[in-house]
């Protein structure tokens, strides 16, 4: 399994990057996870409406910090999902080596931990001129030394060219 921790500020192009890789390799070969997913589920149960204003982003960031300190649920969720993906492929006697997993994580210390514990590489999607940070997780995006940096500083064609280079660097067969 090829595991990549993906980060970038709001609107940097993380989702576009991940979805284009999924489109190129096939839906069954690319999984997109996020440590914030269980936090969003929790937040919805207590009234969050799914919108991501600066106030909402700070709320989600603070809630994630609390839950991580309490019981490490975001990382437990990721590890459980990775086990599920691995077992799914092994059940059908298919090598998980042909699978790419993107995990969205914002906090530098959590990125470092995930890279170490999951044998992952880190990717920063950088886009000049995006909105300013409303919370520490967004503000700390650049406070990590990433393995791969994708400069999303032009048009979609340029981003797609960088995605093609990324695809050439990994050893996963397309559909």
Name each model feature, range by range.
Residues 6, 102:
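Hydrophobic anchor at the beta1->P-loop junction of P-loop NTPases
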Residues 14:
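Conserved lysine of the Walker
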Residues 34-98:
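ATP-dependent small-molecule kinase phosphotransfer cores
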Residues 109-117, 121-175:
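Small-molecule kinase domains that catalyze NTP-dependent phosphoryl transfer to phosphate-bearing small molecules
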Residues 9:
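P-loop (Walker A) phosphate-binding loop of NTP-binding proteins
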Residues 17:
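Hydrophobic positions on the alpha1 helix immediately C-terminal to the Walker A/P-loop
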Residues 1-4, 98:
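Pre-Walker A (Motif I) flank of P-loop NTPase domains
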Residues 23-32:
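Post-Walker A helix-loop "phosphate-sensing" segment adjacent to the P-loop in P-loop NTPases
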């Amino acid at each position: 399994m090829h595991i990549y921790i993906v980060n970038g500020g709001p609107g940097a192009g993380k989702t576009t990057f991940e979805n284009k890789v999924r489109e190129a390799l096939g839906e069954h070969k690319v999984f997109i996870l996020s440590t914030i997913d269980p936090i969003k589920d929790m937040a919805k149960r207590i009234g969050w409406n799914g919108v991501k204003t600066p106030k909402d982003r700070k709320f989600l960031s603070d809630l994630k910090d609390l839950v991580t300190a309490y019981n490490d649920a975001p990382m437990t969720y990721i590890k459980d999902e990775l086990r599920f993906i691995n077992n799914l492929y092994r059940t059908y006697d298919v090598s998980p080596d042909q699978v790419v997993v993107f995990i969205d994580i914002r906090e530098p210390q959590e990125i470092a931990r995930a890279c170490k514990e999951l044998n992952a590489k880190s990717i920063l999607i950088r886009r000049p001129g995006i909105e300013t940070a409303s919370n520490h997780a967004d503000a700390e995006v650049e406070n990590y030394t990433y393995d791969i940096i994708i400069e999303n500083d032009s048009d979609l064609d340029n981003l797609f060219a960088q995605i093609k280079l990324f695809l050439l660097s990994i050893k996963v067969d397309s559909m």
